[in-house]
Amino acid sequence: MSETRYEIRPIGVIRSELASREAAPRQGYESAPDAWVEVNSAVAEGLEGISVGSEIILITWFHKAHRDILKLHPRRDKSKPVTGVFSTRSPDRPNPLGLHRVMVLEITGNRLRVGPIEAIDGTPVVDIKPVLLQSMDS
């Protein structure tokens, strides 16, 4: 395995009522609450063009994840067969990146209220990308 390393610097943080992994739903569509994304002032200019009603992809770093897990029961359900972590959306993985498709509900300065999102309070945000609605073939 390559020993090349890359540095990722968070651009912000999630502020959520979800205080622990146990409190978080497995997926955003499973009764996840709204949350705030607090974007660092040094990169806040990058929010220009994002508007209320926009769908965005938040890329987060699951800072509470176990990075040494390669196989698991999907959704921690012991009745399901063990499978490789790359065939699941488990936060426990070698590089615990989270992808969250959310709606922008409110913008206040360098803060975005988004939802629904299953990320816990304090989760680092490493990037924000727009949802592209057009086909990649066009």
List the predicted regions and their residue ranges.
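Glycine-rich, low-complexity intrinsically disordered segments
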Residues: 1-101, 105-138
